[in-house]
Each structure stands twice: as C-alpha cells, then as structure tokens.
Amino acid sequence: MIGYLKALDDNYIWTIENDGELIVVDPSMAEEVVSKIEKENLKLKAILLTHKHGDHTGGVKLLKEKYNPVVYGPSEVKNLCTEDEVVGDGDSIEIMGMRIEIMKSNGHTEDHVSYLVDGNLFCGDSLFSAGVGRVFTGDYKSAYETMERFRKLPDDTKVYPAHEYTVSNLKFVLSLGENKRVEEELELARDVVAKGGCTLPTTIRKEKEINPFLMSKNLEEFRKLRDLKDRF
C-alpha cells in the first residue's frame, strides 16, 4: 500500500507498507515518519533517497539512530549510506519481497535516481506533474535524456514526485497557449489543494498530455521551456 506524509511547505514523503513493514522515500523530516510508525506499530525497513538536497534527506539521521533501517541512495548521498547501499542506473534491490529497480534521472542533481516499484515511479525532483525540476547542474542534456527515459515507460506507470507543484506548473503550461485539457486539470488541481488533498500520483499517460517538458521534441526545446519556467 502506497501512502504519503506531508512535510515542510510542499514536500511529500512517500510510504510503502506491507504486512506491518514500512519503506519511506525522501524523508525530509523525521517527526512525521516517527509519528506514523509509533501510531501504527510499524517496522521501518528501508529509506530510499533520490538525491542529496536537504528537503529530501533531513530526517535520515534521526530515523537511522532510532530504527536502524537500510538506507539506499545514489553516490551523492553516500555519506548517509554504507558502500553496499549506494545504487545507480540498472541496479535492483529487494525489500519486503518487492523488487525495486533504479533508474538514472539526473539533471536536477548530478546523480539523481528514481525508483520503479511494480509500476510505480518514485522520481524525487526529476519529474513533476506538468513540470520538471530545476536543472541545478546546468546539464540540460542529461535532464532531457531523463525525459526520454521516462517517456519509454508504460503509459499506466504511476508517478510519485516529491512536491505539490501541480497548480503552479499547470499555470505555466497555460501561459504557453490555450489548452482545454490543461484548463480542466488546473481546475481539478485547485479544488483538491483547496481541500487539503494531494494531486498525486499522476501517470506517464497523463503527463504525455499535459507536460511539455516530458514531450519536448529535442534538447533545444526542452532548454527553452526550462528557461521560460525559471523566469515565470
């Protein structure tokens, strides 16, 4: 069962539960995770980290001290993992009887990875609903190649980004020109957020319809869109 915990201003800590055991993805803070574990009497088996930013790793130290879970992540977070727990493109791990595949998804950071779990993509800040993460590395080629890899996933793949950016991203897409589908999605997303809900997960199929970054025809178009979004 996949769930979420809200954290900081707009972060989601994604949770995967099975038979009293728990995996958390990108725990930006420990308090919400501890509360869930204690309230539901769960055993924290593993932490999956997509990249090094503090709003994705802030809770790791306390959670490790309190529960001693296995921590997996890319080389840029090796200070939080043991050598055997550093993962990269093409690797796979098994936790709680589930096979988890690791996909390279860099661009936002140098070694950003995503985790594919039974048709569910936990993509950190590499892909958002109707958007994409800032390219802090300046490596737009890698960020565009990440979009190409995501496009090849099955359309019914569920996508779990780490932030609630859907409304602002849809507003940007509408600034590029009229789009009835995007207008409808914006209205729905606004309603969900106003009620304190979560607009995620999305799907690869849906993103192919509303996300211009994912559907960029070439690197030049992708970079132009990202530059426009940076100034939006």
Predicted regions and their residues:
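Active-site HxH/HxHxD metal-binding segment of metal-dependent hydrolases
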Residues: 8, 22, 29-102
